[in-house]
């Protein structure tokens, strides 16, 4: 059974909830997400199912607008993100998105590809390349103006 977040995700929410306008959860741990969001009923949350969210009713990808920025978000396993990012980039561009958020690799990533900015926050509970991470993005007037990969707070 995949269970990635345990208390790491809850620690991130505790630290960041007052500073964020919305949360985008990129899959693998939907049961943990539901529990972690209970104390924050006003937080706008968007989520997709990952390859370890067996039986989930959430979609595999989504599209949302934040401050004039069209955001395509997905776990990424259906777009082959462990092998290359071309399919993901094309899928985001086809939907008119300026930003594509993805997970699945458990590796933090940020890159501009043509008109699409690609961002992977890493993993709150099982980052493969170092400390567990999450991501913060600032969007203004249809553009990513700042991004950051942050280490998940310790206990």
Which residues does each predicted region cover?
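Residue-level detector of beta-strand structural context in well-folded domains
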Residues: 61-62, 108, 135
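Conserved beta-strand segments of alpha/beta enzyme cores
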Residues: 44-46, 70, 117, 145-146
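Core catalytic region of metal-dependent phosphoesterases/phosphodiesterases
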Residues: 2-66
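Active-site-proximal segments of metal-dependent phosphoesterases and phosphodiesterases across multiple
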Residues: 57-95, 125-128
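Active-site environment of divalent metal-dependent phosphoester hydrolases
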Residues: 3-7, 30-34, 52-57, 79-84, ...
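Binuclear metal-dependent phosphoesterase catalytic core
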Residues: 5-12, 67, 93-96, 112, ...
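Histidine-centered active-site/metal-ligand motif
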Residues: 1-3, 25, 75-77, 104-106, ...
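Active-site neighborhood of phospho(di)ester-bond hydrolases with catalytic His/Asp-centered motifs
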Residues: 22-28, 46-51, 72-75, 99-104, ...
């Amino acid at each position: 059974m995949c269970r990635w977040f345990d208390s790491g995700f809850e620690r991130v929410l505790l630290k960041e909830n007052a500073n964020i306008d919305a949360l985008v959860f990129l899959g693998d741990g939907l049961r943990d997400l539901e529990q972690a969001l209970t104390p924050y009923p006003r937080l706008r949350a968007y989520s997709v199912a990952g390859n370890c969210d067996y039986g989930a009713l959430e979609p595999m990808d989504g599209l949302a607008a934040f401050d004039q920025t069209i955001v395509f978000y997905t776990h990424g396993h259906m777009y082959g993100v462990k092998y290359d990012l071309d399919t993901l980039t094309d899928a985001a561009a086809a939907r008119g998105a300026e930003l594509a958020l993805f997970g699945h690799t458990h590796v933090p990533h940020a890159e501009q590809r043509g008109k699409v900015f690609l961002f992977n926050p890493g993993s709150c509970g099982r980052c493969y390349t170092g400390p567990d991470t999450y991501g913060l993005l600032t969007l203004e007037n249809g553009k990513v103006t700042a991004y950051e990969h942050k280490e998940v707070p310790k206990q």
